[in-house]
Swiss-Prot record:
GO terms for biological process: diaminopimelate biosynthetic process; lysine biosynthetic process via diaminopimelate. One of its GO terms (molecular function) is 4-hydroxy-tetrahydrodipicolinate reductase. Belongs to the DapB family. NADP(+) binds at R39. (S)-2,3,4,5-tetrahydrodipicolinate binds at H160, G169, T170. This is 4-hydroxy-tetrahydrodipicolinate reductase. Keywords: Amino-acid biosynthesis, Cytoplasm, Diaminopimelate biosynthesis, Lysine biosynthesis, NAD, NADP, Oxidoreductase. PROSITE patterns: DAPB. It comes from Salmonella enteritidis PT4 (strain P125109). The active site is at H159, K163. The keyword Cell inner membrane does not apply. Its main location: cytoplasm. CDD domains: DHDPR_N. Its EC number is 1.17.1.8.
């Protein structure tokens, strides 16, 4: 293997995101697809991962056992469900493997487990691996510092009918970016639902609205509304490949890291802007 390459393992190889990750890994210079995983009992076990993803034969066979492929990868990429990701996290921590985590929907205990593991292994944990979304998060911080104290802030997100968590991890990251810029804790100012007689809008809150329909890949808007004007900052994704490429870019970035918890803004160097 070339010294500059990083070998990656992909969790949930047969899922929508898993297949995109496999395609991206096969196409990206400096990355080698080392392993592809599916759950025990899946009909996809034994398949060629590249053929499964529509990218041609890869020579990597889809397996269910991390133990069986532990010597075949350096970084584990996981966009599955919280319970599965935490199982994979424990394995990677035990065996000194880096992780790129795009799974959303973790509770506080799950997030704490990731923080603790990052003391021993290097982890990029982000709600969204799109370059555009992470640029948007930086713009939201700037906008919040200028307009946040004088405007009503609402976050609207839309995803496909199969998404199981709400609000999306990206929407929550947007809220956290805005709240942090205003020296607030999102838990103290977020409003996640409105129904019936709600009374007037409470000043200083950040509202969330969620849409689930069709095959929407992902759309997010933050609205700063004042009397007579409003500013809207929007990101729309048309392909999951943007997330896959960002995840692979993160895996390459991790090759020089021994431990620590990072996000996509670290990978892109946005915090210096």
């Amino acid at each position: 293997m070339h010294e500059a390459q990083i070998r990656v393992a992909i969790a949930g190889a047969g899922g929508r995101m898993g297949r995109q990750l496999i395609q991206a890994a096969m196409a990206m210079e400096g990355v080698q697809l080392g392993a592809a995983l599916e759950r025990e009992g899946s009909s996809l076990l034994g398949s060629d991962a590249g053929e499964l993803a529509g990218g041609g034969k890869s020579g990597v066979i889809v397996q269910s056992s991390l133990e069986a492929v532990k010597d075949d990868f350096d970084v584990f990429i996981d966009f599955t469900r919280p319970e599965g990701t935490l199982t994979h996290l424990a394995f990677c921590r035990q065996h000194g493997k880096g992780m790129v985590i795009g799974t959303t929907g973790f509770d506080d205990a799950g997030k704490q487990a990731i923080r603790e593991a990052s003391q021993e292994i290097a982890i990029v944990f982000a709600a969204n691996f799109s370059v555009g979304v992470n640029v948007m998060l930086k713009l939201l911080e700037k906008a919040a510092k200028v307009m946040g104290d004088y405007s009503d802030i609402e976050i609207i997100e839309a995803h496909h009918r199969h998404k199981v968590d709400a609000p999306s991890g990206t929407a929550l990251a947007m809220g956290e970016a805005i709240a942090g810029a205003l020296d607030k804790n999102l838990k103290d100012c977020a409003v996640y639902s409105r129904e019936g007689y709600t009374g007037e809008r409470v000043p200083g809150t950040i509202g969330f609205a969620t849409v689930r329909a069709g095959d929407i890949v992902g759309e997010h808007t933050a609205m700063f509304a004042d009397i007579g004007e409003r500013v809207e900052i929007t990101h729309k994704a048309s392909s999951r490949m943007t997330f896959a490429n960002g995840a692979l870019r993160s895996a390459l970035w991790l090759k020089t890291k021994k431990n620590g918890l990072f996000d996509m803004r670290d990978v892109l160097g946005l915090d210096v802007l």
